[in-house]
């Protein structure tokens, strides 16, 4: 399985959680039919605006879907956090 560093995790102005990998592009992720999408312009995976799931649920789901696409995404000390509360950051990093 390929690994890639997560360079940024954030919540955008549309209230979608996004995860930005350093190198890997997930242009065909729509084929998984998992509600995880790829933003080809900004180069990140993203969820829909949460309704029944929390941001933590969506984070875990995106990570699993990426692994199903043969890529393990890894948080590093260089990962940037945008519009993420300290509580959510702590939960994600557990």
Regions found by a protein language model. Name each.
Residues 1-94:
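Accessory DNA-engaging acidic/polar modules
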């Amino acid at each position: 399985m390929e690994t890639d560093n997560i360079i940024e995790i954030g919540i955008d102005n549309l209230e979608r959680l996004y995860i930005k990998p350093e190198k890997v592009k997930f242009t065909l992720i729509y084929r998984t039919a998992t509600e995880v999408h790829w933003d080809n312009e900004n180069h990140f995976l993203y969820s829909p605006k949460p309704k029944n799931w929390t941001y933590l649920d969506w984070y875990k789901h995106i990570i699993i879907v990426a692994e199903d696409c043969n890529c393990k995404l890894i948080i590093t000390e260089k990962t940037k956090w945008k519009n993420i509360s300290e509580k959510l950051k702590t939960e994600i990093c557990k």
